[in-house]
C-alpha cells in the first residue's frame, strides 16, 4: 500500500505491506520529498517493480514512473505524463486511481489542474500505457472526462474533482470511480469500460502531436 507521509522537507511517498488488511507492516519512505499521488503496478515488469508518482521538481508537477528490483532502490526515473501548457491540465497533474490492466493497455486515471483568477480547477483525465512497457504512453485524453458540477463547487476547497480509487467489474464491464468533491464529500462516477477504452483509442497518441481540442 502506498500512502503519503510527512517530513520536515514536505510530503513523501511511503509503503506498508499487508496480507490480510488486518495487520500492517510499515516499510517507510520510498522516494524523497516533495512527492505524492503514487501507486505501484499490480505486477512486475522484467522482474522490476514500477511506481507511478508525482514529485515536485523546481516547481514542475508532472507524473513520473520509476523502477526498482526490491522496493528499496529506485531508478530509471522518467516523466510519464507532463503538464500541457495552455490546456485544462497545464499547471499540475497527479495520479488518481491505481493503474488498471485492460486488453488495450494500462488505464491511468489522473487529475489535472488549471489555475485561474478565481482559483484552481481540478478535473479528471485518462491515459493508456503499453501493457509490457508501461513507460510508453499510447493514448492521452484531449479533454477532461469529469469536472466539478455546480453542486460540487462549494466546500472546503471549491472546484475540486479528485479521483482517488476505482473498481472494475469484469463480469458487468462497469468501471466505478470514487472521487473527492471540493475536499468535503466523496462521489462515485460509473462508466462502461468498453466506452472508456473506445474513447481513449480515438484520441491521438502523444507522438502524433496534441491539439487543444
List each model region and its residues.
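Beta-rich carbohydrate-recognition and catalytic domains
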Residues: 1-91, 100-159, 170-213
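Conserved interaction-surface patches within small, structured recognition/assembly domains
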Residues: 166-168
